[in-house]
């Protein structure tokens, strides 16, 4: 492996003859090329900033306006209504030899044209923002758009017809509206009434009424005031108080995982698969830097906010005693790699050239072939990121703030992302039900010290070439990393490819400098902290029960025949499964996005509704005829869809109450109602996994090019975490988590209840399905 001094531009030694300087020509070359590359990126950002700033206008549209102004002047038609002549009179008559009347006239026309052009841009942008504030289309039946919606769609298409860059729509997106307090209180009480007995509900209703009349008006005024000047009245507080101020371990509690393709694998060569994946990720980062990614669009015309994508790469969560911070760099030219207890730094570029996949394969193979042992304290070092945040912050300050430890830690924290080369093999074997769950467990927590849980994401490569991600949650939500992952898997399969022997295509440069081994000096006191963090993390990991399975009888295709939303279908099945599992209902959390608003993140859909509980109880009792059950099911599905739409359009419950609670804390106002609401446990936390955000291939033509989604740990100690991906027309993947320490939960038992609930719903509509 490369010595540490290879990364240093110059060294000096003191001799009897004086100071002897030794320059490294190669290192200076890297510094020079890095500077050139940095300036290129700055120029690209400036150019993109200008193009983004004038959207939906363009430089071409300015030329059209300028040409029209000049042409009208040529034909003695003053379309400026005297403004050109007025500006011309205001300009000095003498200002050098080239300052002729013609120059003054051209300058005046340019000023007027630019002003008219910018006024037009402002008008079109505000019009587009107004149009994007219309959400009536979401509440209409599919295929039955009203005349208003059709006209609206035409107008949006006209105003956004020019090919947008990634952030072109950011300033045209509307702000997240603040709901009225009475509406939020009404929806909240409606969401819990069927879960409480009459006495408890009356008490809750009195608390809510007291809050609405006495405390809420003052809090609401401050919240509305914030919404006027802040880009988004929720997102900054959500990031800080829900994520960054959390003091419990990130592993299991916050981070989530994403799986690879599970029905196919292009190669079994670990270094080759990783070489293609890393190359594809840096290709994506380059497109991200250049804003050369099309924004995600609902219906193909409604843009989603792209703000969260900014911190995908070069980002690390830095621990603090009271609160963490997110450190984001504009660029990083290396990745940090962990293998067999050692840390390495792998450069992604040779000069200004991105390494080819085969060259990255060479670098990773060099690490795999390196026989050197870990240094004292190095093997389990990453357990610090898996344990308590306060302990990690104190250790970081005490042992990693100077010297070689700081240098090595900087190499990890300033990396584009983290890479873990695992010694285990994992894959999905349909004949072995446990294989998918073991794969998920490896991604969720590994052995508690082979993932750097603070990085924006860790790319994991198993010995057999299977990949996966472990993702930190504070910087963005799951659809963002999903967008990257779809690009990586599509690029790996359909663009980069492999040789017949499973290696990356092309020939590497054998003279590439080898990866740099990071050097540590970890004292025994620090090693004791590392071991303590490891024990905390191991106890947490050992307590997680994860059950992942592929539901084969049907997928989206059959659900559509039931004439209902696939998400509503699954959510009602989850309610039926939970009631059969626990004999009662509970508050249920489903994550919905608010990305139709600027800097929007998520909102909660309280999917255990009065309508869904009525249907479940009727199903369990078994006394109703099918027609009645179908009617109850459709009412429950319609209610769920309506709540989901309300959440997406800014009329949710929980983010509003959360922000009112934050305001109350700032003002020192006590609110028993808010304190009680925010302490209610979510014993069933669910999330649907987004897919096909990028159309890189036809899924019908390549049915095996299918990922299994991802999952997360349980939110409540006696609850379940459930994520699911409706993977095409014929299958659904589920990831169910719980804790062994709870006598009330069992992930596999609940998974079996989910299976049966789905089959029972299909039988209710008598839709043919395949064998399990």
UniProtKB/Swiss-Prot annotation:
Name of the molecule in the record: Carnitine O-palmitoyltransferase 1, muscle isoform
Chief subcellular location: mitochondrion
InterPro entries per UniProt: Carn_acyl_trans, CAT-like_dom_sf, Cho/carn_acyl_trans, Cho/carn_acyl_trans_2, CPT_N
SUPFAM superfamilies reported for this sequence: CoA-dependent acyltransferases
GO BP, sorted A to Z: carnitine metabolic process; fatty acid beta-oxidation; fatty acid metabolic process; long-chain fatty acid transport; response to blue light
Mitochondrial intermembrane topological domain residue ranges: 74-102
Keyword terms: Acyltransferase, Fatty acid metabolism, Lipid metabolism, Membrane, Mitochondrion, Mitochondrion outer membrane, Transferase, Transmembrane, Transmembrane helix, Transport
Residues on Cytoplasmic side: 1-47, 123-772
Positions of transmembrane segments: 48-73, 103-122
């Amino acid at each position: 492996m490369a010595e540490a001094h290879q990364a240093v531009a110059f060294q000096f030694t003191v001799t009897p003859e004086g100071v002897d300087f030794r320059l490294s020509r190669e290192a200076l070359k890297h510094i020079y090329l890095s500077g050139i590359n940095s300036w290129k990126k700055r120029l690209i950002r400036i150019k993109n900033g200008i193009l983004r700033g004038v959207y939906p206008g363009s430089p071409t549209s300015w030329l059209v306006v300028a040409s029209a102004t000049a042409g009208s002047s040529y034909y003695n038609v003053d379309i400026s209504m005297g403004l050109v002549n007025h500006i011309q009179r205001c300009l000095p008559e003498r200002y050098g030899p080239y300052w002729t009347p013609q120059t003054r006239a051209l300058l005046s026309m340019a000023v007027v044209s630019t002003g008219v052009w910018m006024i037009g841009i402002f008008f079109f942008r505000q019009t587009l923002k107004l149009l994007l504030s219309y959400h009536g289309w979401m509440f209409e039946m599919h295929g039955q758009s009203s005349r208003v919606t059709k006209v609206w769609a035409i107008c949006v298409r006209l105003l956004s017809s020019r090919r947008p860059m990634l952030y072109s729509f950011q300033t045209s997106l509307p702000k997240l509206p603040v709901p009225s307090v009475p509406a939020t209180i009404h929806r909240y009480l409606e969401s819990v009434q069927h879960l409480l007995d009459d006495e408890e509900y009356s008490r809750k209703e009195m608390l809510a009424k007291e809050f609405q009349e006495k405390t809420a008006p003052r809090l609401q005024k401050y919240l509305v005031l914030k919404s006027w000047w802040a880009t988004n009245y929720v997102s900054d507080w959500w990031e800080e108080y829900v994520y960054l101020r959390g003091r419990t371990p990130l592993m299991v509690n916050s981070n989530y995982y994403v799986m690879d393709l599970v029905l196919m694998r292009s190669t079994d060569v670990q270094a080759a698969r990783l070489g293609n994946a890393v190359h594809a990720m840096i290709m994506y980062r380059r497109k991200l830097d250049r804003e050369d990614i099309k924004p995600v669009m609902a219906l193909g015309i409604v843009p989603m906010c792209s703000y969260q994508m900014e911190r995908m790469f070069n980002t690390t969560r830095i621990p603090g005693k009271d609160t963490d911070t997110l450190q984001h760099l504009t660029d990083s030219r290396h990745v940090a790699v962990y293998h067999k207890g050692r840390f390495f730094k792998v450069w992604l570029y040779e000069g200004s050239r991105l390494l080819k996949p085969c060259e990255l394969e060479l670098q990773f193979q060099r690490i795999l072939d390196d026989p050197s042992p870990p240094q004292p304290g190095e093997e389990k070092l990453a357990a610090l990121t898996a344990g308590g945040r306060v302990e990690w912050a104190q250790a970081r300050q005490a042992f990693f703030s100077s010297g070689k430890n700081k240098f090595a830690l900087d190499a990890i924290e300033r990396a584009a992302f983290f890479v873990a080369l695992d010694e285990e093999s994992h894959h999905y074997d349909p004949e072995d039900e446990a294989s998918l769950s073991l794969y998920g467990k490896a991604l969720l927590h590994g052995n508690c010290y082979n993932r750097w849980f603070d990085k924006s994401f860790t790319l994991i490569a198993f010995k057999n070439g299977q990949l996966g991600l472990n993702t930190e949650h504070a910087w963005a939500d799951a659809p963002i990393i999903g967008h990257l992952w779809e690009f990586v898997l599509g690029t790996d399969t359909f663009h980069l490819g492999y040789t017949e022997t499973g290696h990356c295509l092309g020939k590497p440069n054998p003279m590439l400098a080898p990866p740099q081994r990071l050097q540590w000096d970890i004292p025994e006191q620090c090693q004791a902290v590392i071991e303590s963090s490891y024990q905390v993390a191991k106890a947490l990991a050992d307590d997680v029960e994860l059950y992942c399975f592929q539901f084969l009888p049907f997928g989206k295709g059959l659900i559509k025949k039931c004439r209902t939303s696939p998400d509503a279908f699954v959510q009602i099945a989850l309610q039926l499964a939970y009631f059969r599992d626990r004999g009662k209902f509970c508050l249920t959390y489903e994550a919905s996005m608010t990305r139709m608003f600027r800097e929007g993140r998520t909102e909660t859909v309280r999917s255990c509704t009065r309508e869904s509980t009525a249907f479940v109880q009727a199903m369990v009792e078994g006394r109703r005829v099918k027609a009645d059950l179908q009617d109850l099911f459709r009412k429950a599905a319609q209610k769920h869809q309506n709540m989901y739409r309300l959440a997406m359009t800014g009329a949710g419950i929980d983010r509003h109450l959360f922000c009112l609670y934050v305001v109350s804390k700032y003002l020192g106002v006590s609110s028993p109602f808010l304190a009680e609401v925010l302490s209610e446990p979510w014993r069933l936390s669910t999330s649907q996994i987004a897919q096909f955000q990028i159309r890189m291939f036809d899924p019908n033509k390549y049915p095996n090019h299918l990922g299994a989604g991802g999952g997360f740990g349980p939110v409540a100690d006696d609850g379940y975490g459930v994520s699911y991906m409706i993977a095409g027309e014929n299958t659904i993947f589920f990831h169910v988590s719980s804790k062994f320490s709870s006598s009330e939960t069992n992930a596999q038992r609940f998974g079996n209840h989910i299976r049966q609930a789905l089959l029972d719903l299909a039988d209710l509509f008598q839709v043919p399905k395949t064998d399990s």
